[in-house]
Structures are given as C-alpha cells and as structure tokens.
Amino acid sequence: MLALRLLNVVAPAYFLCISLVTFVLQLFLFLPSMREDPTATPLFSPAVLHGALFLFLSANALGNYVLVIQNSPDDLGTCQGTMSQRPQCPPPSTHFCRVCSRVTLRHDHHCFFTGNCIGSRNMRNFILFCLYTSLACLYSMVAGVAYISAVLSISFAHPLAFLTLLPTSISQFFSGAVLGSDMFVILMLYLWFAVGLACAGFCCHQLLLILRGQTRYQVRKGMAVRARPWRKNLQEVFGKRWLLGLLVPMFNVGTESSKQQDK
C-alpha cells in the first residue's frame, strides 16, 4: 500500500514534468525554427498555425486533467452507520478505493497519473484527457521529427528511418556528431510516441466499455449489466452537449438519469 501511495504522488509529478518539457521545447525550439520561412504571411505562417493548434490541444488536455481531479469521488461514509441507514448504500458497481480512501460511484479504475479514481463523475473528462493528451503527444512528435530532419539533415522517407533513428543518434552522440540538445529531442520523440499510442489505446478501450454500458471494475468482477442502446450509454457519459464539451473543457454535462444514478 505504501508503494501505491508513493506512485500516486510520483505519477502526477511525472506527467507535469513531461508537460513542462513539452511546452519548453515547443516554445524555444520548434516555434523559432518555423519562423525562419520568409515566404509565409504573418497571419498564416507555420509558427502561428502550429502554435494555435498546439495551444488548443494542450489547453484541452490540461483542462480536462484538472477537471478529473476536481470532480473527485464521493467521500467515505455512505455505507457506514446503523442498519437503518444501510438501504441507502450505493449500487454494487460502487467501490471503495484504499489508495484514495473514498467511495466511487460506478467505479472504473484508479488513475495514478491524476492521483484520483475514475467513476461516474469524471469519466467524461478522463476520456477527453486521454484523447487530447494522445493528440498533443503525437503532434509534438511530428513537429519534433520536422525539427530533427531540418537540423540534422535526416530524411524520414524510408519506413524504418524512425526506428533506426535512436540507435544511430546514440552512436553519433558519443562520437560528438550530435549535440546534447538534439539528442534530448530525439529521446522525447520516442516518449511522445509511446505516450500518444498508450493514451489512444486506453481512450478507445474506455469508449468500447461505454458503448457496452460497462466499467472496468464491472468487467473484472464479472458483474452483469442491463442491456441498453449504445446511444443512451454514450449520452449518459457525454451528455446532450457533447460537442461543446469536446471543444472546451467543462464540467460533467450528463443527462438527468446519470445524475440520479450518482445520488
């Protein structure tokens, strides 16, 4: 349990450090290299378009990250008390997390990167957090590849060029042919690629469970769920104003039925 609580502190710090490093690289390396194009107009220059897109992806990722933490699970105490109070206990899908010491309605899993449990109150923000984190990482990887290609005069036309970039760069780094800053960017390329794929896969997995009306906790425990149309399952999580929530980080906009289940 001590190791889990320690991981609950280290993982958010790791995520915030990676986010800070990404912002620094975008601001001081990638954007200045795009400003060197003299043929581009000031309004539609690559630097402006790249900065606007990266800011949009990052704002949604960090905004939903904060909302996942703010929409924390309910405090412990719902099932405690006398026998007369026991009928008010939550449904079987409710779970008590020993790491959070809280009760989560429609518990899915505990996310160490947010230091919080994922349930009915923050599932929507968690999925959008995974989506925009994946997009931000993959987009940063593409921008980093363009930067490395221009600085080191490397062509990525070959399908295996990205796979052979790391071992080749390591040997050139120790021989003095590659600067330390460029080597750091190359390492970040693979980190962005790994995090982007992991978040994309996790987002798709969560969406599949939502379409089925299930949570990871219910699947792990073998709990039976009531069959419902997939549209209703999506609306329960994302609400009727799903498009607005997809573009702007905002609190849960679930339907009235989902709000009643949280009570």
Swiss-Prot record:
<keyword id="KW-0808">Transferase</keyword>
<keyword id="KW-0256">Endoplasmic reticulum</keyword>
<comment type="similarity">
    <text>Belongs to the DHHC palmitoyltransferase family.</text>
</comment>
<dbReference type="GO" id="GO:0019706">
    <property type="term" value="F:protein-cysteine S-palmitoyltransferase activity"/>
</dbReference>
<comment type="function">
    <text>Palmitoyltransferase that could catalyze the addition of palmitate onto various protein substrates and be involved in a variety of cellular processes. Catalyzes the palmitoylation of KCNMA1, regulating localization of KCNMA1 to the plasma membrane. Might also mediate palmitoylation of CNN3.</text>
</comment>
<feature type="transmembrane region" description="Helical">
    <location>
        <begin position="147"/>
        <end position="167"/>
    </location>
</feature>
<dbReference type="GO" id="GO:0005789">
    <property type="term" value="C:endoplasmic reticulum membrane"/>
</dbReference>
<feature type="topological domain" description="Lumenal">
    <location>
        <begin position="31"/>
        <end position="48"/>
    </location>
</feature>
<feature type="active site" description="S-palmitoyl cysteine intermediate">
    <location>
        <position position="111"/>
    </location>
</feature>
<protein>
    <recommendedName>
        <fullName>Palmitoyltransferase ZDHHC22</fullName>
        <ecNumber>2.3.1.225</ecNumber>
    </recommendedName>
</protein>
<keyword id="KW-0333">Golgi apparatus</keyword>
<feature type="topological domain" description="Cytoplasmic">
    <location>
        <begin position="1"/>
        <end position="9"/>
    </location>
</feature>
<keyword id="KW-0449">Lipoprotein</keyword>
<keyword id="KW-0472">Membrane</keyword>
<keyword id="KW-1133">Transmembrane helix</keyword>
<feature type="topological domain" description="Lumenal">
    <location>
        <begin position="204"/>
        <end position="263"/>
    </location>
</feature>
<dbReference type="GO" id="GO:0072659">
    <property type="term" value="P:protein localization to plasma membrane"/>
</dbReference>
<keyword id="KW-0012">Acyltransferase</keyword>
<dbReference type="GO" id="GO:0000139">
    <property type="term" value="C:Golgi membrane"/>
</dbReference>
<feature type="transmembrane region" description="Helical">
    <location>
        <begin position="10"/>
        <end position="30"/>
    </location>
</feature>
<feature type="domain" description="DHHC">
    <location>
        <begin position="91"/>
        <end position="131"/>
    </location>
</feature>
<dbReference type="InterPro" id="IPR001594">
    <property type="entry name" value="Palmitoyltrfase_DHHC"/>
</dbReference>
<dbReference type="Pfam" id="PF01529">
    <property type="entry name" value="DHHC"/>
</dbReference>
<feature type="transmembrane region" description="Helical">
    <location>
        <begin position="183"/>
        <end position="203"/>
    </location>
</feature>
<comment type="subunit">
    <text>Interacts with CNN3.</text>
</comment>
<dbReference type="InterPro" id="IPR000731">
    <property type="entry name" value="SSD"/>
</dbReference>
<dbReference type="GO" id="GO:0005886">
    <property type="term" value="C:plasma membrane"/>
</dbReference>
<feature type="transmembrane region" description="Helical">
    <location>
        <begin position="126"/>
        <end position="146"/>
    </location>
</feature>
<feature type="topological domain" description="Cytoplasmic">
    <location>
        <begin position="168"/>
        <end position="182"/>
    </location>
</feature>
<keyword id="KW-0564">Palmitate</keyword>
<feature type="topological domain" description="Cytoplasmic">
    <location>
        <begin position="70"/>
        <end position="125"/>
    </location>
</feature>
<keyword id="KW-0812">Transmembrane</keyword>
<dbReference type="InterPro" id="IPR039859">
    <property type="entry name" value="PFA4/ZDH16/20/ERF2-like"/>
</dbReference>
<feature type="transmembrane region" description="Helical">
    <location>
        <begin position="49"/>
        <end position="69"/>
    </location>
</feature>
